[in-house]
Amino acid sequence: MARSIGCAVMVVGDERQAQSGQLLVRLLEEAGHNITQDRTIKPDGLQIKGELAMLTQSQSSQAIFFTGRTGNALRDPIGDAVRQQLDRRLDGFGDLLRSLLYQEQGSRAMLAQGVAGSIERKLVFCLPGDLNTIEIAMGKLVLPELEYLLNQLTPRA
């Protein structure tokens, strides 16, 4: 059996985005992972950066998930706020997510902003708030590789 990974879930937005956080929590728990934080924060770049800084110092969270407000509109600050803080980027995540979404949505998939990478040996994922997109991202990309990705961040003796 795979190890249980401590996961923080941050919903950026309001009650409309709350369902995306609930879905993330359910999928992570069903996969056997432990939810260390689960809360909603304002769509403000400075607050997102502050939460991210706090979570990267936490000993209980090895993976951090942001959802909601990842689009290209000016009111969607997650992608830029997190991307600026990453030590290493996992650009293939966004590419693969858009490819999977293209199969269902067509050209609208180019607007999807999936961001992933690491900060201080913690994985960070930014997922759109759309429930179908979360199901696809978690089921086909994140959950199958989460433990492997964390192992890549751990120095070998």
Mark where each language-model region is.
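Non-catalytic beta/alpha edge segments that cap or flank active sites
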Residues: 1-157
